[in-house]
């Protein structure tokens, strides 16, 4: 049987939008933990403004994610490809933060129903999220199909707050298969100036994914914006909650520079003839005050919008 991780990666790349909202079966199989470390156990966390925010500037739209904030600066909800993910908080709260219980979304389309729930959050002493659990389920009465999965994330960071490693573990089942599981990790490498150089995905001792960056111009990332081009492609293409938390700054500080190119490679240990490569050519439009107005990937443009600490849009 072909390597499960590679098959799921290929499927995600070919049907990105469809996967995200209608077939999350492949979510996170692409990036699970090889390590024997225990996934941290969490629960409610104090959830306010992350330490990655510079001068109060926060995104309301970036990398296809649209974010709405409460008056106290906490996130109300986020929209990803037309699906709204709601941030659920405890009734009691302190000034500047709330107790985050879960992030949830539901979607129905004819005879198909889907549900996402992220919970069991871990908040580290550096102010960033150290882990969470994502549960997904889907039932399609039209095709007599169902599937369920649970993904557990663990994040570690460098001393300067930049993400260093993502460990993951997943268990799943569906209408055809019994329960099964997988694991793997992503590792990040930076240069001496704080620019992201490489992301490597491994599973069971095999490197199946590499994402390497090139810099030809000196574009400073003034407001520490975590564009999703600075995260693993096969993870951002399959997990909407990861996308939201990354863009809003809860998964660490971003690369200090913005790359102009990314070279991606996907490897299959059993069928090397199916290995693939891809190149992203990255272009940015940056305002005179350092805010990213938009960026493009191979010509496809993504709008970015930001607000200041007073919730006023920055022009």
Regions inferred by a protein language model and the residue ranges of each:
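Bacterial N-terminal signal peptides that target proteins for export
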Residues: 3-18
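N-terminal hydrophobic targeting signals that begin at the initiator methionine
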Residues: 1-2, 33
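Enrichment for repetitive, rod-forming helical segments
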Residues: 19-20, 250
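Buried hydrophobic residues that stabilize the cores of well-folded domains
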Residues: 35-315
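C-terminal motif of bacterial Sec signal peptides marking the signal peptidase cleavage site
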Residues: 28-31
């Amino acid at each position: 049987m072909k390597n499960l991780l590679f098959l799921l990666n290929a499927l995600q790349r070919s049907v990105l939008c469809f996967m995200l909202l209608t077939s999350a079966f492949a979510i996170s199989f692409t990036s699970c933990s090889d390590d024997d470390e225990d996934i941290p156990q969490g629960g409610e966390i104090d959830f306010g403004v992350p330490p990655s925010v510079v001068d109060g500037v926060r995104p309301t739209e970036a990398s296809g994610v649209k974010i709405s904030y409460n008056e106290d600066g906490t996130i109300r909800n986020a929209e990803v490809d037309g699906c709204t993910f709601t941030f659920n908080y405890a009734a009691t709260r302190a000034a500047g933060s709330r107790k985050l219980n879960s992030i949830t979304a539901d979607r129905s389309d004819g005879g198909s129903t889907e549900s996402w729930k992220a919970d069991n959050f871990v908040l580290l002493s550096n102010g960033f999220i150290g882990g969470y659990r994502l549960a997904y389920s889907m039932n399609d009465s039209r095709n007599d199909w169902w599937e369920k999965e649970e993904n557990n994330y663990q994040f570690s960071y460098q001393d300067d707050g930049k993400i260093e490693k993502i460990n993951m573990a997943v268990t799943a089942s569906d209408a055809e298969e019994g329960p099964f599981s997988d694991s793997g990790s992503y590792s990040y490498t930076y240069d001496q100036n704080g620019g992201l150089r490489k992301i490597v995905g491994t599973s069971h001792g095999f490197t199946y994914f590499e994402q390497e960056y090139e810099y030809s111009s000196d574009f400073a990332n003034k407001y520490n914006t975590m564009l999703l081009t600075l995260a693993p492609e096969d993870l951002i293409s399959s997990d909407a909650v990861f996308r939201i938390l990354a863009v809003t700054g809860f998964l660490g500080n971003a690369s200090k520079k913005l790359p102009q190119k990314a070279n991606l490679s996907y490897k299959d240990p059993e069928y090397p003839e199916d290995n693939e490569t891809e190149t992203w050519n990255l272009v940015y439009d940056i305002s005179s005050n350092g805010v990213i107005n938009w960026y493009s990937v191979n010509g496809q443009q993504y709008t970015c919008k930001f607000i200041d600490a007073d919730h006023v849009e920055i022009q």
